[in-house]
Amino acid sequence: MKLGIVGLPNVGKSTLFNSLTKAGAESANYPFCTIDPNVGVVTVPDERLNLLGDFYKSKKVTPAVIEFVDIAGLVKGASKGEGLRNQFLANIREVDAIVHVVRCFEDSNVVHVDGNIDPLRDIETINLELVFSDLEILERRIAKVTKTARMDKEAAKELTFLEKVKAHLEDGQLAITLETENEDEDAWLATYNLLTAKPVIYAANVAEDDIADDGANNAHVQAVREYASKQNSEVFVICAQIEEEISELDEDERKMFLEDLGLTESGLEKLVRASYHLLGLMSFLTAGEDETRAWTIKIGTKAPQAAGKIHTDFERGFIKAEVVNYQDLLDCGSYAGAREKGLVRMEGKDYVVQDGDVILFRFNV
């Protein structure tokens, strides 16, 4: 999974990116690597994985990962050539979802580019740049499809749909809020890879005083939540300044620091939870002496397709899936014990994998 972090200058975007990636870097349980200065890979915190690794005394424990991209150049006027237009467009088109950092704190020492704090204005500023970029794509596609629409019924249908999407964007709406009418429209929309069709998570960056109650008394946060609800987007409250402090601590110190603030989870954990929920993701597990590993899949994925995440041969030659819930396995004390109690099941190709399933795939190629 790849998430692109965007935001106007001085909203805390780079602080958040650096804090999240550094937190992953310095935690012994969650290794981190840097691809380049603007890309970081952070492992997904998952207590189940560590418990299973201890259970099997695994030589290796491999968590799921999220790739964060710090999207540069997204400023007012970017669609007209301001900022680093080509760079940000190339980067943002590759991500699965957008994390939009919005400033919800007052601080006279940190000047806002527009002079005052207004997160909804900031959101609209960036959305407008994304809309302009999408309109360019649609206009190029319309020009191409128009050439064959008179002689090709399918092209004519697509042209009608393109005009529908264009009108939606010109009305100030995002592509993600467009209601499609059939599978053809879904397929066409997917091929355009529009920026405004990507799911969005709003990171409401607040002052330290607002973090304990999750921004309940912050009018800016409430405005962002109301806006996001109309897009079926996720909102999580974070204090980038606190995350920066947390990133300097080891695991034990981090837990104590969070407890002192009245928090049960870090910003990274909040973001992971919001991302999985928004994108409809979950994890199944494979476990053994050699390796215990988490695999990220879409909710609703069937066993053969889950097997294909490990290797294409597993999906192609799928026979059965040997399945046990991770908690049942731990409670029984051994795999044999879980089998004796009838908790290990043999599932076929129509089985829908559940979050926390520990699976051994049977296959033959």
Residue ranges, per PLM feature:
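Conserved G1/Walker A P-loop phosphate-binding module
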Residues: 1-111, 139-140
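C-terminal-of-GTPase-core extension/linker across diverse P-loop GTPases
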Residues: 2-6, 17, 146-352, 359, ...
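Glycine-rich, flexible loop/turn motifs
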Residues: 23-31, 38-40, 48-51, 80, ...
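Amphipathic alpha-helical transducer elements in NTP-driven molecular machines
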Residues: 32, 46-49, 62-68, 82-96, ...
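Fold-independent oxyanion-binding glycine-rich loops
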Residues: 38, 71-72, 102, 141, ...
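Long, charged N-terminal accessory/stalk domains
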Residues: 85, 89-191, 202, 236
